[in-house]
């Protein structure tokens, strides 16, 4: 059992390392969104050094007039590269460490979802591998550099699979809650897309739910929990 688990961990790390190979080249590829996201990370680092936390307005942006990018674009996950910058890493190294962790998260997320649904190890490993080398991931990291959108891809499978499992079973939808919490703190548009997909799934199952008060209670509790956890993002945005 332990040997099998060790092999799985080694496999996941090896596949992630293979996908990470383009990052071993010197420099940062300048995709369409690269200037924006690099500026977010660097300005977040500068704001933290000024003692500002949490950072909603990045003071060094917009010719040092400040720009409220953190109000509409969640900064939660780019605190990691920003803190690495504070620790003395270059912007390039900070971004590449973040990207490696992001690739690992993408694999583990899809692996976990498929394993949870099927109970099988090898299909889950295959799904994780295919997901890591899928066009949205490769394009988001190595071409367009849409880091926030790619970060959301970590939580999209959790949200959708969480909804599927919640429809099928009378269990608390913790996967659904984690998925939407991560989506909200990653990318607002991806959250909206996931909401639409989950709503469609809910509508088709509605006739089966009418008399199930426990299921509605679980769903409302999950919605309230996610809303409370993510209020630091959507509260200032709505204001």
Please describe what each predicted stretch is.
Residues 1-239:
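Membrane-embedded transmembrane-helix bundle of lipid-linked glycan/lipid transferases
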């Amino acid at each position: 059992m332990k040997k099998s688990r060790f092999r799985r961990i080694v496999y996941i790390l090896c596949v992630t390392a293979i996908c990470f190979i383009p990052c071993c080249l010197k420099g940062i590829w300048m995709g369409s969104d690269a200037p924006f996201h690099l500026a977010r990370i660097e300005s977040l680092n500068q704001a933290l050094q000024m003692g500002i936390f949490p950072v909603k307005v990045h003071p060094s942006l917009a010719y040092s007039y400040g720009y409220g990018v953190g109000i509409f674009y969640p900064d939660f996950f780019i605190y990691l590269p920003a803190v690495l910058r504070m620790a003395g890493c270059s912007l390039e190294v900070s971004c590449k460490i973040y990207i490696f962790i992001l690739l690992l998260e993408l694999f583990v997320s899809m692996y976990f979802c498929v394993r949870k649904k099927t109970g099988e190890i090898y299909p889950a490993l295959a799904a994780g591998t295919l997901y890591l080398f899928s066009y949205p991931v490769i394009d988001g990291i190595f071409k367009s550099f849409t880091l926030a959108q790619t970060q959301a891809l970590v939580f999209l499978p959790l949200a959708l699979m969480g909804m599927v499992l919640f429809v099928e079973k009378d269990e608390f939808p913790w996967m659904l809650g984690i998925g939407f919490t991560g989506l909200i703190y990653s990318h607002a548009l991806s959250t909206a897309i996931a909401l639409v997909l989950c709503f469609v799934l809910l509508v088709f199952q509605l006739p089966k739910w009418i008399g199930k008060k426990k299921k509605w209670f679980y769903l409302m509790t999950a919605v309230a929990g996610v809303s409370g956890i993510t209020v630091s993002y959507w509260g200032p945005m709505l204001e």
